[in-house]
Amino acid sequence: MAPRGKRLSSTPLEILFFLNGWYYATYFLLELFIFLYKGLLLPYPTANLVLDVVMLFLYLGVEVIRLFFGTKGNLCQRKMPLGISVALTFPSTMMASYYLLLQTYVLRLEAIMNSILLFFCGSELLLEVLTLTAFSSMDRM
């Protein structure tokens, strides 16, 4: 924890967490509607559709936990929650990559939405590492 009066929280990181929270909520709802569209109009195998929807709900859980711990760690200037958020960035990135590249059918809208999610993940990872470095350097003083 930082000394009294010394603030090490990253404002750009907090802005990214806030924007990503709203963006992910929109992404999740749009992705549900896209799966409904795919299930009704495309010859989408039922097993694949169920798997993709279940994975989307798992992705929701991972992303909500990641954003919660990232925000908590940044605002409270704690390394452990921010480290958990960094660790959860990798499964989150893998899920976004799966929905970008490995689904049965990938629509152009999904490609754009997942590219934006990957941009958020990459930017947040960079700022989280910089913030963790700042927190660690203050512990040594």
UniProtKB/Swiss-Prot annotation:
Record has Cytoplasm as a keyword: yes
Chain's role: Part of the tectonic-like complex which is required for tissue-specific ciliogenesis and may regulate ciliary membrane composition.
Keywords: Cell projection, Cilium biogenesis/degradation, Cytoplasm, Cytoskeleton, Membrane, Transmembrane, Transmembrane helix
Name under which the protein is recorded: Transmembrane protein 216
Membrane-crossing residue ranges in chain numbering: 15-35, 49-69, 82-102, 115-135
Gene: TMEM216
Predominant place of localization: membrane
Organism this protein belongs to: Bos taurus
Top-rank lineage group of the source organism: Eukaryota
Topological relation to the membrane, as annotated: Multi-pass membrane protein
